[in-house]
From Swiss-Prot:
Biased composition (Low complexity): 1702-1713
Region ranges (Malonyl-CoA:ACP transacylase (MAT) domain): 935-1235
Gene encoding the protein: nscA
Source organism per UniProt: Trichophyton tonsurans (strain CBS 112818) (Scalp ringworm fungus)
Cofactor(s) it depends on: pantetheine 4'-phosphate
Region described as C-terminal hotdog fold: 1490-1636
Cofactor, free-text remark: Binds 1 phosphopantetheine covalently.
Sequence segments annotated as region (N-terminal hotdog fold): 1326-1462
Keywords from the UniProt entry: Acyltransferase, Multifunctional enzyme, Phosphopantetheine, Phosphoprotein, Transferase
Name by which UniProt lists this protein: Non-reducing polyketide synthase nscA
InterPro entries hit by this protein: Ac_transferase_dom_sf (IPR001227), ACP-like_sf (IPR036736), Acyl_transferase_dom (IPR014043), Acyl_Trfase/lysoPLipase (IPR016035), Ketoacyl_synth_AS (IPR018201), Ketoacyl_synth_C (IPR014031), Ketoacyl_synth_N (IPR014030), PKS_Beta-ketoAc_synthase_dom (IPR020841)
Length: 1802
């Protein structure tokens, strides 16, 4: 902090110049921008944001020609690179940028010094020249630095407006030069007085008769110079006209944009238009706080408010003359002493200038000699190093890349191999491997073979099909169908996370909800080629791109965003950029990003070759003169990115830092695939501006470098122009190196960008730029010739790239997409990390390894051993930290505690050398064992217990200290000296002893919880029961301390010390009594049983002498006895004196129900509620026997304890642990502390034990106290247990499809349709075109011809407008026909099929064509699914010529197969109501209140809309009462064709509703007719019978939501029983004048035209090729149809599964069985053969071997997900007749549980 700023006697001038500092302006603005992103410069950031907003606002108001001169910008920094000088906005931009710079530097100076506002009125005065006065005005109006951020932005507004206005006026005086040459509007003349210059100008202006507006005038003057202003041509003429001026010393000033200080030109109205605009947000009444000197008078402006001040300034700038002498005089006057106390003066300025130096010299000359004048620079702060940036927001953060992984060509399956490949300069070019496709058939260099590739070359990864399916919980079947890109995305994501040390949830930034995935992918080879040969259950999740990311999120349980991006060749780096954007936006805290490409499809080779993308000669020849295209490549890469501050907080290794990332598009390119230098350069500038980086500082660029003539030329131009410009030139030590990884490994397309990034990251790690191998002959002549002069070029040899001391290297990575996208990343070195050295290391360290299979675990151990052999110097502490805290852990585990690397190596070798090692590996159980805390009594007390934990772990220390403070507040002594071992060895008092033990135990219990141990129950031994009750929440910790302390005090007060003693006897209570029977009979001794610890371990107590006698007696009988080191005999009569008082004290303590079960040694039971826990309990626990053995037995009996339960002994020494092991020999008992052992080592050993038992302790908490002392090691990656899941492309069908010549006209599907045999043929359903039947699903496609005689006659039975119109009864019959047919195909022995036709909707009326001999085809598609007992149907028009279906269906419906008894029951409840209404109608007809219509009259009324043929006229009579009616119906006896239910019968029993709407007096049938837009359901309890009599009833009513729509239910009765119902039939009112429009016959034989494929399901009738189901599409406008033809909306029903295989069946590679994670007992064959059948079926469907289905194998591990469980469930039912719901796989999660269920219930 500058001390002068705190001097209250200091007189200060702040001078705001009208000139920019002499520094590099771009660099100044970059630094301002970067500082503004630091939270230490909050106000600077606000000012820049406000200024940017104001400039945007002002630019938006400009006239269009001016507005177009300003490029879009997000910050003022973006405008620094734009040259406005030659345009009309030069003055505006220069003025506003100068204002921004000076005020930004001013604000930043104060924030950098972290000083208070110290500009005191009277002591501080402001001065400035020209535009500088506006910046000074912002300070003058401010009373704090925060004010400057607001007022400063308004000063920017005025500066901009002033510049625009002046330029506009000035161009009206003289137009700019047509060639863009800049001319000065002002000259300075020296060694002449103002008067003499004025005389010369007056003579010129008068003599040339100049107009007043264009005269030359004096704009500024001082003692030594005069500034002359005017139009440039007029100034030139004036100097030529006047000999005095011509020969004077003069020079032009850099004033190019117009006139200011011209009183003859501007008036008050001009000033008002700039200053007093209504858009200004300045508070007009804001007070002037500081004096601001006028540049004309040298005196302060008189204005008192903001509006007046800006008005005065505007007047001076436009009309006033600058007099520097007056300014100097004003400054001197302010700095002259006002009192004796004032002794120092200071001028603050922005660097210095000629003018400022003159002012400074003049001021020094005028000041008194006792005045000390200093000058302070307000710019110098900007170059200071303020240490690591503290981001002001997430958007200001730098990003850290912390992990990476790859699968790249040339065997580069890891980073080391990739680097070796680069370092050696290897080329991975090869020909296409046979497992991709056969070059013998698919390669034709001549290009004559259609669909063949013209190049045989590529770059391919090794073993693309190898995958550890079991690790990722996938079945072999699912793995095989899953795209290798998806699989390797999973693998590399895991490896990158492993390298980064990411354990989801370990830190806030790695919480699963804050992790997202971003991957680039540009092809679907596997889905389109390999997997499509045999489409299975997993076709969609295995092939659709979105599942690649989704699978990563699902496996790791990340719930952040998941994006799959396609930007062609830049997809990988664009995904990284999207990830960076998400991090900057705060959408995620950790991002996994990458690019994916695995080549299998020859079609893409052919397409790219035909488009001239690919080289026919081999590898990418980047920058070579013979570059002829790129060479394709596989590639998979993943990186893990965090914000830098998060990575540092997480103790991550940082590979490099991302400063900026951007993507734009080459919109101005000559073609969509041609690169554009301008767009690339704009993207570079965006990234550089975002980071505030000087492009000259970038020293390495990884080029996109495809090796094409256009691409190389354009990229070399853009890179050299921005990063190595002609001026300013790079210094000799600023060499810019270039590289292109495509010359090594080819163009990975979607993975190209990620490969480039991985190379750049390795360059940072290795400090070496690998040599470029792309130039095979000589450099491409299109590359700029002057690259060497610009100090830029390719690294042709392996070139060291050392990190400069104290600096960071900058690198750029480019990736461009063929579609025009450009993505650029800017990187810098990671911050230098100084590892904190610990004062002492831990004695032992936990080393952990895990895997999901035995094979992988053994391999991981081998890898670690190999690593240690190669790196014996490895830090054991770092290794423990890495393997424990920074690894995800799995169910196959190895753990050990070692004290040296050599000891670990020995341990690993001994394990691996054991031939039975693999077979001895056991997985940890799926369900972690329970953990019980056992709290010891005071017998384990010693000084220094837990001291290491107290010193090492802040949490434990805080717990002890908090509890200790509670004890002290209760009046008890501090126990901390005991814990720290700062107490003398003399025996401690009972109070200190017991409090120390209880406080230690409560703290230890909480510490175990911190370490991730979930407690199942507690048990306390004697004193330990108080700690147990506190931990269980029965009493508070404070109450436990209080009771223990007071009890100890009572013991001291009431009980004689050393009068009694306690004896531990190695015998049971009964045995002791038997052995002492003689002594007891003689009453020579007495004792009491204090503790029954085990069945053979008893503690007795009593008077000291008698206990000694007992000891001697028992020892004489060879019984082991030990006198306990306690001063009292607890749990004996000695405690009687304290019991009443103790109980009284305890009654004041609240007891609560335990939060976890309490195992009670007093009651020998498990306590779950508070009923048994009260003050009396504590009384009894003090006096009565501690029956520890019985308590444990009770816990076992109640199921709380089993053989797997883990016991943690909580206390100073593991006493309870020994007791537990005596009771349960197999029990695992862990000590917390142990006498004479480092307690950290004890805890470590316990954590390893817990880990191996199946718990996952919180290692992060264990290492947290000293995490900065540890480093994350780059250990060998996880060793996968891989199997090759590869579906080879068989045959030549990609070539064969080209043989279908475009000119060949296919036969229509109807050619001979009536003659071809069909399994299903009726009057309406004519031909099956496709059919597939599986276990639980069936799909059927049929074709019908409406012109077929039977169909046509059915249509003509229902005519409208003299046209035959298909009634919905036709669709009903077709639906029932297909429904019964398919249902019987799946369930062949069904007696009757009862169908409910629901959701009937028709979009278009089907009108019969009147063209003779025409074909009018219809297509019906149906898909039945037994799992839902439903069948979806959709009807489509088809083209009579081509057979192509319309894109959208004209009708849809759903059939539901239901239980008719349910209908019968429902209708039985309604029948009396319907019959009642019928009776009422009959009665009203008799009374003449309702109309009774005969058949002729009824159908005559119908003719208002529809004319029915005789067979349709089934209604004998009708009673009509407004909108309610009933009809007597007799069906005609003839069927007239082959039907399921004849349409004329359906119509007869149901069209009463149409009569009500179109024949009732309640309807306006003159102007309207009514049509039905569908119904909700149609069902018949039994089939309609020929000639049978029925009754129909309906009541229609308007819908409240739509008055033009009516609805009602049509009931069909036979006798008294309801036998059918049309539910919610709807009718819409339609104007009659639309009849012709909707019901006219088609004019051509083609009623549907081919349309482009839609999203989702589309198909041709002749071609059953299928895609994913379509989503419902928005409904088109309603189309009205006949009364019985529904018309509402169209929707695409979900398409059925594929009907036909489109290629030969793939040959599946032989699968090796997955190594199961357990060497467990196989599921034994059982007598019930159903079990083995089920197992075989599961194995077959999942692709596993039956042997893999072990009893403890979980379905999750086997990859049986919800989809597979549905498949299995249906297979069980269809093949084995076993009803197993899919939910059972959740209820029985393992094979063993499932087989047990089958045995029990099947």
């Amino acid at each position: 902090m500058d001390n002068s700023m705190m001097d209250s006697t200091l007189r200060r001038i702040l001078f705001f110049s009208n000139e920019f500092p002499s520094d590099d302006l771009k660099d100044l603005f970059r630094r301002l921008d970067q500082h503004s992103k630091d939270r230490r410069f909050r106000l600077l950031s606000i000012f820049l944001e406000e200024s940017t907003a104001i400039l945007k606002d002002e630019v938006s108001k400009l006239p269009r020609p001016l507005k177009e001169l300003v490029p879009p910008f997000n910050s003022v920094l973006s405008l620094v690179d734009v040259d406005f000088r030659q345009g009309p906005l030069g003055a505006a931009m220069e003025s506003s940028m100068l204002t921004i710079l000076e005020l930004g530097l001013f604000i930043g100076h104060y924030e950098s010094e972290d000083t208070e506002w110290d500009l005191v009125p009277g002591q501080s005065v402001l001065a400035g020249l020209s535009i500088g006065i506006l910046a000074a005005a912002a300070v003058a109006l401010s009373s704090s630095l925060a004010d400057v951020a607001k007022t400063g932005a308004e000063a920017v507004r005025v500066s901009f407006r002033l510049g625009v206005y002046v330029a506009d006026i000035s161009t009206k005086l003289e137009a700019p030069q047509s060639d863009g040459t800049l001319s000065s509007w002002a000259h300075v003349v020296t060694e002449m007085t103002e008067a003499s210059v004025q005389d010369e100008l007056k003579q010129f202006n008068t003599g040339t008769h100049s107009p007043e507006l264009t005269k030359v005038f004096v704009s500024a003057a001082d003692k030594t110079s005069v500034s002359v202003s005017g139009p440039p041509s007029r100034i030139k003429a004036a100097f030529q006209h006047s000999p005095v001026l011509r020969y004077s010393k003069s020079l032009p000033l850099p004033v190019y944009d117009g006139l200011c200080h011209a009183s003859h030109l501007y008036t008050r109205s001009d000033i008002d238009s700039i200053i007093n605009s209504s858009e200004s947000v300045i508070l007009p009444d804001r007070s002037v706080r500081l004096a601001l000197l006028s540049s004309q008078t040298g005196k302060p402006f008189v204005a008192k408010t903001a509006s007046d001040l800006f008005l005065e300034i505007g007047t001076e700038l436009l009309t006033g003359t600058i007099y520097l002498d007056n300014v100097t005089a004003g400054i001197v006057q302010h700095l002259q002493p006002q009192s004796k106390e004032t002794s120092s003066c200071q001028i603050d300025s922005f660097r210095t200038s000629l003018v400022l130096r003159g002012i400074h010299s003049a001021v020094e000359a005028e000041l008194s000699r006792d005045r000390q004048l200093t000058r302070r620079d307000l710019v110098s702060w900007i170059s200071r190093d303020f240490g690591p940036r503290r981001p002001r927001s997430q958007a200001s953060s730098k990003l850290a890349i912390v992990g990476m992984a790859c699968r790249l060509p040339g065997g580069a399956n890891d980073l080391d191999l990739f680097w070796k490949l680069l370092e050696e300069g290897r080329d991975t070019l090869t020909t296409v491997p046979p497992d991709r496709f056969d070059l013998n058939t698919h390669y034709d260099p001549t290009g004559k073979t259609e669909n063949a590739t013209q190049t045989p070359y590529g770059n391919f990864i090794d073993r693309p099909g190898f995958f550890d399916a079991g690790f990722f919980n996938m079945s072999p079947r699912e793995a095989e169908q899953t795209d290798p890109m998806q699989r390797l995305a999973l693998v590399t994501a895991y490896e990158a996370l492993e390298m980064a040390g990411v354990v989801p949830g370990r830190t806030p930034s790695t919480h699963p909800s804050r992790i997202g995935t971003f991957y680039g992918q540009a092809s679907d080879d596997w889905r389109e080629l390999n997997a499509s040969q045999n489409i299975s259950t997993y076709a969609v999740p295995g092939g659709e791109r979105s599942f690649g990311n989704g699978r990563i999120n699902y496996f790791f349980k990340f719930s952040g965003p998941s994006f799959n991006l396609d930007t062609a060749c830049s997809s990988g780096l664009a995904a990284v950029q999207a990830a960076c954007s998400a991090l900057w936006a705060g959408e995620v805290d950790t991002a996994i990003a990458g690019g994916l490409n695995v080549i299998t499809d020859p079609d893409n080779y052919c397409g790219l070759g035909n488009a001239h993308f690919l080289s026919k000669t081999g590898q990418c020849k980047v920058w070579d003169k013979d570059a002829d295209g790129y060479c394709r490549a596989d590639g998979i890469g993943s990186v893990v990115i965090k914000r830098l501050e998060d990575a540092e907080a997480d103790n991550d290794n940082i590979l490099a830092v991302v400063l900026g990332a951007s993507t734009n598009h080459s919109a101005e390119a000559i073609s969509i695939t041609h690169p554009h230098a301008g767009a690339q350069k704009a993207n570079y500038r965006q990234v550089l501006n975002q980071a505030g980086v000087n492009p000259i500082d970038v020293s390495y660029i990884e080029l996109h470098g495809t090796g094409t003539q256009a691409g190389d030329a354009v990229e070399s131009e853009s890179v050299s122009d921005i990063f190595a410009p002609v001026t300013p030139r790079r210094r000799p030590d600023q060499r810019l190196y270039l590289g292109a990884v495509k010359s090594n490994i080819g163009h990975g397309e979607a993975a190209a960008g990620i490969a480039s990034l991985l190379k750049a990251l390795l360059v940072y790690q290795k400090n070496l730029i690998p040599k470029h191998i792309g130039i095979k002959s000589e450099i491409n002549p299109t590359i700029p010739k002057d690259l060497e002069r610009r100090n830029v070029g390719l690294a042709m040899q392996n070139t060291p790239w050392p990190r400069p001391a104290g600096k960071k290297r900058l690198a750029v990575v480019n990736s461009f997409g063929a579609h025009g996208g450009n993505t650029t990343l800017l990187l810098e070195d990671a911050p230098e990390r100084v590892k904190i050295q610990g004062t002492e290391d831990r004695i032992t360290h936990s080393i952990l390894l895990s895997a999901k299979s035995k094979t992988s675990l053994q391999a991981n151990m081998e890898s670690l051993l190999s690593y240690l052999d190669q790196h014996p110097e490895t830090s054991l502490a770092d290794l423990a930290y890495t393997t424990s805290s920074r690894r995800m852990h799995h169910n196959m585990r190895f753990g050990t505690l070692v004290s040296s690397i050599s000891g670990l190596q020995k341990m690993l070798r001994s394990q691996l050398d054991n031939p039975n090692f693999a077979s001895e590996i056991r997985p940890v159980p799926n369900e972690a064992p329970s953990v019980i805390l056992a709290f010891t009594g005071q017998g384990a007390y010693y000084h220094g217990m837990g001291s290491e934990l107290f010193a090492e772990f802040p949490y434990f220390r805080a717990q002890v200290q908090q509890l200790d403070r509670l004890a002290q507040r209760l009046g008890f002594p501090s126990v901390v000296p005991v814990i720290e071992n700062r107490i003398e060895d003399a025996p401690s008092s009972p109070i200190l002893t017991q409090l120390s033990v209880v406080i230690l135990e409560i703290a230890l219990a909480r510490f175990w919880s911190l370490l991730g141990v979930s407690i199942s129950a507690v048990i306390g031994h004697s004193l330990g029961e108080y700690a147990a009750l506190a931990v269980a929440g029965v009493i508070s910790a404070a109450d436990a301390i209080y009771l223990v302390g007071r009890r100890a005090q009572l013991v001291e007060e009431r009980c004689a010390q050393a009068s009694h003693s306690m004896l531990s006897v190695r015998a049971s209570e009964d045995a002791i009594q038997e052995m002492l029977a003689v002594e007891l009979e003689t009453a020579s001794i007495t004792y009491e049983v204090s503790c029954c610890n085990t069945n053979q371990d008893t503690v007795i107590g009593g008077p000291k002498g008698e206990i000694n006698d007992i000891r001697r007696a028992l020892e004489a009988k060879s019984i082991k006895c030990t006198i306990l080191d306690v001063p009292y005999a607890f749990h004996t009569a000695q405690m009687n004196p304290i019991l009443d008082d103790l109980e009284t004290l305890a009654k004041a303590v609240p007891f609560k129900a335990p939060s976890i079960p309490v195992i009670s040694p007093l009651l020998a039971t498990v306590i779950y509620d508070v009923k048994s826990l009260d003050a009396n309990y504590l009384r009894r626990a003090t006096r009565e026997t501690v029956d520890f053995a019985a308590a444990i037995e009770a816990a076992q009996d109640m199921g709380l304890v089993d053989s797997k339960t883990i016991w943690i002994d909580v206390g100073p020494h593991p006493i309870c642990a020994g007791l537990v092991r005596s009771m349960i020999p197999s029990a695992s008992a862990i000590p917390s502390c142990r006498r004479n052992e480092d307690s950290i080592a004890t805890i470590s050993k316990g954590l390893v034990t817990l880990y191996l038992a199946g718990l996952t302790p919180s290692w992060v908490e264990f290492f947290k106290p000293r995490e900065r002392e540890y480093s994350l090691l780059y250990l060998p990656k996880y060793r996968w247990n891989e199997t090759d899941y590869w579906i080879p492309y068989i045959g030549t069908w990609t070539l064969d499809k080209a043989h279908l010549k475009h000119g060949t006209k296919p036969k229509t599907p109807f050619s001979g349709s009536m003659s071809r045999p069909s399994a299903l043929r009726t009057s309406l359903v004519h031909q099956i075109t496709a059919e597939t039947v599986e276990a639980t699903t069936a799909t059927l496609h049929t074709i019908s011809d409406m012109q077929h005689p039977d169909f046509l006659e059915a249509i003509h039975g229902h005519t409208m407008n003299k046209c035959g119109v298909a009634t919905s009864s036709i669709w009903s019959d077709m639906a029932f026909t297909v429904g019964e047919y398919l249902y019987r195909r799946l369930v062949p022995n069904t007696k009757d099929v009862h169908m409910n036709l629901t959701d009937v909707e028709v979009l278009h009326a089907q009108v019969a064509s009147k063209t003779k001999g025409s074909v009018q085809p219809l297509v019906l598609r149906a898909h039945l699914d037994l799992s839902t007992n439903s069948m979806s149907l959709a009807w489509f028009n088809a083209d009579g010529e081509t057979g192509e279906c319309a894109a959208e269906s004209f009708a849809t419906a759903t059939i539901r197969f239901e239980d008719p008894e349910a209908w019968r029951k429902d209708w039985a409840r309604l029948a009396h109501l319907v019959r009642g209404r019928i009776e009422v109608l009959e009665q009203r007809a008799t009374e003449g209140k309702a109309s009774r219509l005969s058949k002729p009259l009824a159908y005559a009324l119908f003719k208002n809309v529809v004319d029915y043929a005789d067979r349709y006229r089934g209604m004998d009579s009708v009673v009509l009462d407004e909108l309610e009616a009933m009809a007597e119906v007799t069906l005609v006896p003839e069927r007239y064709g082959t039907w399921h239910t004849p349409p004329h019968w359906i119509d007869s029993v149901s069209h009463l509703a149409g009569l009500v709407m179109n024949g009732s007096d309640a309807s306006n049938t003159r102007d309207y007719f009514f049509v039905t837009p569908g119904c909700d359901s149609f069902r018949l309890l039994k089939k309609l019978e020929p000639g049978a009599r029925y009754r129909s009833y309906v009541r229609m009513s308007p819908l409240p939501e739509d008055p033009n729509m009516h609805s009602g239910d049509v009931y069909i009765l036979q006798g008294e029983e309801i036998v059918g119902m049309v539910g919610m039939i709807r009718f819409r009112r339609v104007p009659r004048l639309l009849m012709d429009r909707f019901f006219s016959p088609p004019t051509t034989t083609s009623v549907a035209v081919p349309v482009p494929p839609l999203t989702g399901a589309t198909m041709k009738c002749k071609d059953i090729t299928q895609t994913a189901p379509a989503l419902p599409t928005p409904a088109p406008p309603i189309v009205v149809s006949s009364p019985v033809v529904s018309s509402t909306m169209a929707c695409n029903i979900p398409e059925p599964a594929p009907l036909l295989a489109t290629s030969s069946k793939s040959s599946t590679p032989k699968e090796s069985p997955i190594v199961t994670p357990a060497e467990s007992e196989r599921a034994e064959p059982v007598d019930n053969s159903m079990t083995s059948q089920c197992l075989r079926l599961m194995a077959r469907e999942t692709g596993l071997e039956v042997e893999a289905l072990t009893a403890d194998a979980s379905f999750v591990q086997l990859g049986v997900d919800s989809l597979m469980s549905l498949v299995l469930s249906e297979k069980f039912r269809a093949e084995l007749g076993v009803e197993i719901k899919s939910s059972l796989f959740l209820e029985c999660p393992t094979i063993g549980e499932m087989t047990a269920w089958i045995e029990e219930y099947c």
